[in-house]
Each structure stands twice: as structure tokens, then as C-alpha cells.
């Protein structure tokens, strides 16, 4: 499902009609968030977001995993494994698991650190990570889930859209009322520029959160390889238009754009149509790393896709922070709290 357009406008008739349901959803979410979570013998750092959909959580989790590794730690990634069908909890092996089994984010995270997909059993997944050598656990999503105690929580916000109309789903994009979420967070990371993100940053500051600023930076080599080539772009992420705008900002030539819902499970027939359209126009297909990761598994293992998927270019992005030592400060805080709860 794609987010309704009215979520990103000032509250109107649609959000007003849905607000009673949003009030119930918000109350239930806050009641769940107030429950004590189970604890494991490792610091837990959670990367979540206050809204439904993507805002840059996975690149943030990757940046944190890489920083922990550079510090000499052995971090594990922990996530639900959205769309995965394999029995969970499960340690991801990219050599045998496709996105159909473990979800797209898990395959990306597993390139940087050992990764556990846990389904709804995050506490069991965290325990598995610790038993197999995790010194730290980085949760990709799960801020609103109470099952696992978090030593540090970071909320990631898209600077362009912020929290939209600031209403709780289905009246708006929020998973729960904003201020109580900020009260449970240690930091808010605003990714990208925009007045909507600035407003969230101001509220986060008033709530006592550390405010960080960051940007998703496309891989220069990948961009250079696509210059001068006609492109057809497709994406099934929280805001596909954000991906398309990135391509245009980098000076790439887009002939067409195809937007799909977040975590869209691509069917072979859909990809075949895109491939044929690209061939007919002498273009190359380009997509996000997440979307490219979903083009794995038995559905895309047939001979008709031999060599075809290699021609679909992913555009990797990395998180750049305005404060170089921000991640170290978060890790230090998590480790201090972990030591305090052990004594």
C-alpha cells in the first residue's frame, strides 16, 4: 500500500474523519510501548522512526554497524524480516537466503554484519545474537515494539516530509502520538533538508532529544557509471519520488519512472515488462539497493532471467552525518547504560 497523499498535507476532511480510529491506534501503541521489555547481555541500540514507511532507517543502521566494527566490536543486526517466509529467528546467510525468505533489508544488513531476522520474536532473536557472539545489537525498526529492552533509541525522520499532518494512522503517518514517542527517544536524526524536518527537530529539542542531521549520499562510482545512459527507474520504497529526485539531482537522464508500494513483492512478469520497455527504448533499468535485493529467490532463478538481472543497476547510498562523532556518542551512551543495568 502506498501512503495516501492527504497524510502529507495539512489536516483536512479525510484526516478528521479518520482521527477517531487514529486515537484508538495511538492509545494502543502507547500502552504497548509502556511495557517493560526483556533484557539480553549486550547493549541494544534501536533505529526506528515515528511514522509508517521508510525514512532512512536501514542506511542509519548500516552506518552504526560499520562504526561499531571500526571500534573493534562484533555487532549483530536484528530486524523483523519484513515479508520473509523462513522460520524465525534465523541467522541470515545471503548465499542461500533470498528476499522471499528473509526480507530485503536483511540482505543489505548482512553485507555489513551478522544479521538475525526474528519475525515477532525480537527477544528470542536478540538472545540468539548474544549466544552466537554479538557484543552489541543494532535493531533496524522496532522502536514501538516493547518486547526487547533498548539501551538507546534513535528516531529517523525524512527531512522533506517530517511527520506529515502529525496525525496517527490511518488519519496520518504517525505510528503513535509524536510527543510521547520523543519522550522515549534519545536522539532524532533528520535525514535530508526541509522545513518539515526542521519543525520535528525543534520539537525534539524541546523534548530533550539530541538532534542529528544527515544526508543519503549516492555512491559516486555508481552515479558515474550511469551518466550519459538513458534510464528507466523503478522503486518500491516508502517514497519512490525521493529516489527519482536523487537520480535527477545527480544529472542522470530518466526516460520513465515507475513507483510501487513500499516493500512491493515484485512478480517476474512485472520485471519482464520493465526489461522489455528498457530494451525497446535503448535504456537501462535503475533501482534502489532494497528493490534490487528483492529480485532474488526461486521466482527469479529461471533461465529467462539469466543475465537479465545483472543489467538492472542498483544505486547504493550511504549516510553522511554533519557531526562525525555522533555515532560514537550514541554507542558510548548505550554501553554506559548497559553497564549500569548489569550492576
From Swiss-Prot:
Coiled coil: none annotated. ATP binds at residues 51-58. It catalyses: a lipid A disaccharide + ATP = a lipid IVA + ADP + H(+). Pathway: Glycolipid biosynthesis; lipid IV(A) biosynthesis; lipid IV(A) from (3R)-3-hydroxytetradecanoyl-[acyl-carrier-protein] and UDP-N-acetyl-alpha-D-glucosamine: step 6/6. SUPFAM superfamilies: P-loop containing nucleoside triphosphate hydrolases (SSF52540). One of its GO terms (cellular component) is plasma membrane. Its EC number is 2.7.1.130. One of its GO terms (biological process) is lipid A biosynthetic process. It is an enzyme of class 2 (transferase). GO terms for molecular function: ATP binding; tetraacyldisaccharide 4'-kinase activity. InterPro entries: LpxK, P-loop_NTPase. Keywords: ATP-binding, Kinase, Lipid A biosynthesis, Lipid biosynthesis, Lipid metabolism, Nucleotide-binding, Transferase. Belongs to the LpxK family. PANTHER family: TETRAACYLDISACCHARIDE 4'-KINASE, TETRAACYLDISACCHARIDE 4'-KINASE, MITOCHONDRIAL-RELATED. Transfers the gamma-phosphate of ATP to the 4'-position of a tetraacyldisaccharide 1-phosphate intermediate (termed DS-1-P) to form tetraacyldisaccharide 1,4'-bis-phosphate (lipid IVA). This is Tetraacyldisaccharide 4'-kinase. It comes from Xanthobacter autotrophicus (strain ATCC BAA-1158 / Py2). The lineage of its organism: Bacteria, Pseudomonadati, Pseudomonadota, Alphaproteobacteria, Hyphomicrobiales.
Amino acid at each position: 500500500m502506498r501512503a495516501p497523499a492527504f497524510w502529507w498535507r495539512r489536516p483536512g476532511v479525510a484526516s478528521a474523519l479518520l482521527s477517531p480510529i487514529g486515537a484508538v491506534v495511538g492509545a494502543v501503541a502507547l500502552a504497548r510501548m509502556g511495557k517493560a521489555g526483556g533484557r539480553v547481555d549486550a547493549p541494544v541500540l534501536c533505529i526506528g522512526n515515528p511514522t509508517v514507511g521508510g525514512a532512512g532507517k536501514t542506511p542509519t543502521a548500516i552506518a552504526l554497524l560499520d562504526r561499531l566494527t571500526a571500534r573493534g566490536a562484533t555487532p549483530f543486526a536484528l530486524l523483523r524480516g519484513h515479508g520473509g517466509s523462513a522460520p524465525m529467528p534465523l541467522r541470515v546467510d545471503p548465499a542461500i537466503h533470498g528476499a522471499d525468505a528473509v526480507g530485503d533489508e536483511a540482505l543489505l544488513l548482512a553485507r555489513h554484519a551478522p544479521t538475525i531476522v526474528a519475525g515477532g520474536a525480537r527477544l528470542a532473536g536478540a538472545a540468539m545474537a548474544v549466544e552466537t557472539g554479538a557484543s552489541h545489537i543494532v535493531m533496524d525498526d522496532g522502536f514501538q515494539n516493547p518486547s526487547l529492552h533498548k539501551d538507546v533509541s534513535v528516531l529517523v525522520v525524512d527531512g522533506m516530509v517530517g511527520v506529515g499532518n502529525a496525525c496517527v494512522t490511518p488519519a496520518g503517518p504517525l505510528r503513535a502520538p509524536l510527543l510521547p514517542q520523543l519522550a522515549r527517544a534519545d536522539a532524532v536524526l533528520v535525514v535530508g533538508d526541509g522545513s518539515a524536518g526542521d519543525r520535528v527537530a525543534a520539537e525534539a529539542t524541546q523534548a530533550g532529544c539530541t538532534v542529528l542531521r544527515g544526508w543519503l549520499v549516492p555512491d559516486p562510482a555508481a552515479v558515474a557509471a550511469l551518466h550519459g545512459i538513458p534510464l528507466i527507474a523503478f522503486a518500491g520504497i516508502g517514497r519512490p519520488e525521493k529516489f527519482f529526485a536523487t537520480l535527477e539531482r545527480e544529472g542522470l537522464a530518466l526516460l520513465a519512472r515507475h513507483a510501487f508500494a513500499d516493500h512491493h513483492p515484485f512478480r517476474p512478469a512485472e520485471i519482464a515488462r520493465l526489461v522489455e520497455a528498457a530494451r525497446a527504448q535503448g535504456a537501462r533499468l535503475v533501482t534502489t539497493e532494497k528493490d534490487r535485493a528483492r529480485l532474488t529467490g526461486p521466482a527469479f532463478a529461471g533461465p529467462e532471467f539469466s543475465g537479465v538481472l545483472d543489467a538492472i543497476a542498483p544505486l547504493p547510498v550511504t549516510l553522511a552525518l554533519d557531526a562525525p562523532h555522533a555515532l560514537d556518542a550514541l554507542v558510548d551512551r548505550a554501553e554506559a547504560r548497559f553497564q549500569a543495568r548489569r550492576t
